[in-house]
């Protein structure tokens, strides 16, 4: 019996489908969600969001947000989400370099925090894109 997953951003619905498992990066560490999971509300951290359906793993890069888990339904309200195969690795690398430069030049704690958050987001995007590229080569 699958669990229904909805991934939503402010712009659009990214995914609405029945899946077998969800593995998400939360404030308290990675959480694996299977059908009939206990109710849970948690904060998502930037990281790799994995969706398993019919034995196939689909990785996403998530920049943060919230996840509500009910026994037969999971809703993810994400700041940003990208499928691994949608990430432009060259643009992500350029954005990472720009975030590192902003971090070095930060004059205030606020600027430093913003630059570090952007850097974490771009590092996640790069890691997810690179893992997807390796998986494609192995197939």
From Swiss-Prot:
Keywords: ATP synthesis, Cell membrane, CF(1), Hydrogen ion transport, Ion transport, Membrane, Transport. GO terms for cellular component: plasma membrane; proton-transporting ATP synthase complex. One of its GO terms (molecular function) is proton-transporting ATP synthase activity, rotational mechanism. Pfam families: ATP-synt_DE, ATP-synt_DE_N. NCBIfam families: ATP_synt_epsi, PRK13446.1, PRK14735.1. F-type ATPases have 2 components, CF(1) - the catalytic core - and CF(0) - the membrane proton channel. CF(1) has five subunits: alpha(3), beta(3), gamma(1), delta(1), epsilon(1). CF(0) has three main subunits: a, b and c. This is ATP synthase epsilon chain. It comes from Chloroflexus aurantiacus (strain ATCC 29366 / DSM 635 / J-10-fl). The lineage of its organism: Bacteria, Bacillati, Chloroflexota, Chloroflexia, Chloroflexales.
